[in-house]
């Protein structure tokens, strides 16, 4: 399995949807939001680690059309886009290089204007409670299968506790289904940040505060090739398709196994005092 080069699969992909239409409006949205993010970042004390590595992976994804998923802890409603203010302008304000991300329907898609604005900002609507097979998840897999960058918050909701919530199995579905479609395992890049919970505490008005200490760390790449290889022989994608077609429990077991692997690797970038997570729910027959 190849998680670094998807060029051999590009000819089998549909036309890539990398900039929402109308494109000039999408470019306007990213420019406006990018300027605001840069301004907000400048008003805080920011410490970063590994940003150059993240920029390099974003460039590779854009050039090689190699699927990439960035994951981060979720501390406030504005983690995305504010945290991207540390990226260079050539990425931050270029919608063709920017991430796709998931947005809650009850927050970002509550009226026509919000829906249009956030769609132009490459947000994909997710309905909380509709599970891992909903339309928004399918669209996210489409974007990954085109070799694009997708950013998600795998906890699935905001948490300002010191320890993480367990990662939702939808993360495993994104990785597994992208491989099943394309033969390429998405690269997973972990990001951990501290300070956003002080900028936007849940009990107060949802206005980003300034003058905070913000720390953003990009960890080592997470590879899922070995996990997926346990389900197939000689890189035969048909083996995986046959396995996943048997029943929903086997599918969820596959997705959960990938998710647990990513979860374990993600723990490595978290300060020891903040490590730990809640247990996962049991897979039912």
From Swiss-Prot:
Q: Name one GO cellular component term.
A: mitochondrial membrane
Which spans are intramembrane here?
Answer: 24-42
Q: What is its main location?
A: mitochondrion
InterPro entries recorded for this chain?
Plipid/glycerol_acylTrfase (IPR002123), Tafazzin (IPR000872)
> CDD domains, from UniProt?
LPLAT_AGPAT-like (cd07989)
Q: What class of enzyme is it?
A: transferase
Q: How does it sit in the membrane?
A: Peripheral membrane protein
* Record-level Gene Ontology MF annotations: 1-acylglycerophosphocholine O-acyltransferase activity
This protein's pathway reads:
Phospholipid metabolism
Q: Fetch the SUPFAM superfamilies from UniProt.
A: Glycerol-3-phosphate (1)-acyltransferase
What UniProt keywords apply to this chain's record, in alphabetical order? Acyltransferase, Lipid metabolism, Membrane, Mitochondrion, Mitochondrion inner membrane, Mitochondrion outer membrane, Transferase
List the GO biological process terms.
cardiolipin acyl-chain remodeling; inner mitochondrial membrane organization
Q: Which reaction does it catalyse?
A: a 1-acyl-sn-glycero-3-phosphate + a 1,2-diacyl-sn-glycero-3-phospho-(1'-sn-glycerol) = 1-acyl-sn-glycero-3-phospho-(1'-sn-glycerol) + a 1,2-diacyl-sn-glycero-3-phosphate; 1-hexadecanoyl-2-(9Z,12Z-octadecadienoyl)-sn-glycero-3-phospho-(1'-sn-glycerol) + 1-(9Z-octadecenoyl)-sn-glycero-3-phosphate = 1-(9Z)-octadecenoyl-2-(9Z,12Z)-octadecadienoyl-sn-glycero-3-phosphate + 1-hexadecanoyl-sn-glycero-3-phospho-(1'-sn-glycerol); 1'-[1,2-diacyl-sn-glycero-3-phospho],3'-[1-acyl-sn-glycero-3-phospho]-glycerol + a 1,2-diacyl-sn-glycero-3-phosphocholine = a cardiolipin + a 1-acyl-sn-glycero-3-phosphocholine; 1-hexadecanoyl-2-(9Z,12Z-octadecadienoyl)-sn-glycero-3-phosphocholine + 1-hexadecanoyl-sn-glycero-3-phosphocholine = 2-(9Z,12Z-octadecadienoyl)-sn-glycero-3-phosphocholine + 1,2-dihexadecanoyl-sn-glycero-3-phosphocholine
Q: Mind telling me which SMART domains this protein's record contains?
A: PlsC (SM00563)
Q: Which domain of life is it from?
A: Eukaryota
Locus of motif HXXXXD motif: 74-79
Give the subcellular location. Mitochondrion outer membrane; Mitochondrion inner membrane
Further notes on this entry?
Answer: The enzyme was named after a masochistic character Tafazzi, once popular on Italian television, apparently due to the difficulty encountered for its identification and characterization.
User: In UniProt terms, what function does this protein have?
Assistant: Acyltransferase required to remodel newly synthesized phospholipid cardiolipin (1',3'-bis-[1,2-diacyl-sn-glycero-3-phospho]-glycerol or CL), a key component of the mitochondrial inner membrane, with tissue specific acyl chains necessary for adequate mitochondrial function. Its role in cellular physiology is to improve mitochondrial performance.
Q: What is known of its domains?
A: The HXXXXD motif is essential for acyltransferase activity.
Family per record:
Belongs to the taffazin family.
UniProt name for this protein = Taffazin
* UniProt lineage: Eukaryota, Amoebozoa, Evosea, Eumycetozoa, Dictyostelia
């Amino acid at each position: 399995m190849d998680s670094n080069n998807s060029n051999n699969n590009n000819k089998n992909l549909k036309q890539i949807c990398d900039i929402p239409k109308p494109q000039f409006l999408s470019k306007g949205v990213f420019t406006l939001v990018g300027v605001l993010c840069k301004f907000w970042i400048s008003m805080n004390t920011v410490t970063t680690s590994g940003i150059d590595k993240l920029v390099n992976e974003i460039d590779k994804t854009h050039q090689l059309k190699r699927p990439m998923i960035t994951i981060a802890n979720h501390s406030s409603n504005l983690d995305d886009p504010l945290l991207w203010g540390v990226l260079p302008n050539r990425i931050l304000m270029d919608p063709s290089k920017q991430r796709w991300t998931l947005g809650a329907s009850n927050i970002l898609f509550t009226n026509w204007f919000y829906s249009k604005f956030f769609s132009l900002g490459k947000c994909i609507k997710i309905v909380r409670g509709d599970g891992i097979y909903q339309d928004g998840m399918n669209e996210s897999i489409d974007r990954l299968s085109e070799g694009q960058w997708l950013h998600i918050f795998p906890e699935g909701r905001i948490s300002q506790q010191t320890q993480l919530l367990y990662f939702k199995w939808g993360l495993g579905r994104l990785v597994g289904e992208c491989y099943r479609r394309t033969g390429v395992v998405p690269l997973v890049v972990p990001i951990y940040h501290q300070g956003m919970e002080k900028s936007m505490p849940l009990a107060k008005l949802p206005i980003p505060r300034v003058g905070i200490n913000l720390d953003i760390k990009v960890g080592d790449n997470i590879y899922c090739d070995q996990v997926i290889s346990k389900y197939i022989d000689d890189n035969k994608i048909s083996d995986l398709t046959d396995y996943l077609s048997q029943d929903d429990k086997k599918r969820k077991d596959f997705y959960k196994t990938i998710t647990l692997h990513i979860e374990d690797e993600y723990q490595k970038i978290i300060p020891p005092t903040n490590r730990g997570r809640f247990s996962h729910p049991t897979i039912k027959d």
